Amino acid sequence: MKHKIRLGVNVDHVATLRQVRGGTTAYPNLLDMVKKSVKGGAEQITIHLREDRRHIQLEDLKVLSKHCSVPLNLEMAATSQMVTYAKKYRPDWVCFVPEKRAELTTEGGLDVKKGFKKMFPMVEKLQRIGIEISMFIEPSLEQVEASYEIGADAVEFHTGKWVMLKGARKAAEWKRLCDAAEWAHYLGLNVHAGHGLDYEHSKLINKLPHLQEVNIGHSLVCYALEHGMEESVRKMRKILK
């Protein structure tokens, strides 16, 4: 019998609405939206503390580390400053992601192989204090293997490219995802997925081999503008079986 896929709700774009006026408004209240997400069925909350602070702020990490009732997953760049924050606020998970200041959103996966020497001690330091580590990567066998060698607990596959493609190219990208998931599972890594997922693509991602977790944000926040955060998350929770 297939296990239920864990739903992580990314609330970055709740913070985007708050910050759009330069952070001068206290609404929408991030913790309130987190509580509504949990009530709707979120089993994890994900935030990306970017170096440019375009949405999530350090204060948000501080508040959620104290008051989030489900596991907290912190997405962050591999920098010494971010490692310091992670050590201080102790999220349940840290997901290492790439960052470019000019990008509108994360554009692709992390090159773990290229950054291995820099990230290895970071992974070690965080795991030593009980934080689990995932690597946000493209569905590449090489990147899966590098993630295994660096000691990660999980890989999160970047699904954005697959979401955007059509026809034969979409089918080819799906095969890449499936092959990478099989290899990750064989190596003992947990299999996660995220980026660009909406209700329709979440019906399909259910079929990814060995999938244990998805992290979804933008589409849920958009749907919530009409139907509320709790209902938005509840609808997604029903899809992920």
From Swiss-Prot:
1-deoxy-D-xylulose 5-phosphate binds at D12, H13, R50, H55, T105. GO terms for cellular component: cytosol. The record marks E156 as: Transition state stabilizer. It comes from Bdellovibrio bacteriovorus (strain ATCC 15356 / DSM 50701 / NCIMB 9529 / HD100). Its main location: cytoplasm. It catalyses: 3-amino-2-oxopropyl phosphate + 1-deoxy-D-xylulose 5-phosphate = pyridoxine 5'-phosphate + phosphate + 2 H2O + H(+). This is Pyridoxine 5'-phosphate synthase. Signal peptide: none annotated. It is an enzyme of class 2 (transferase).
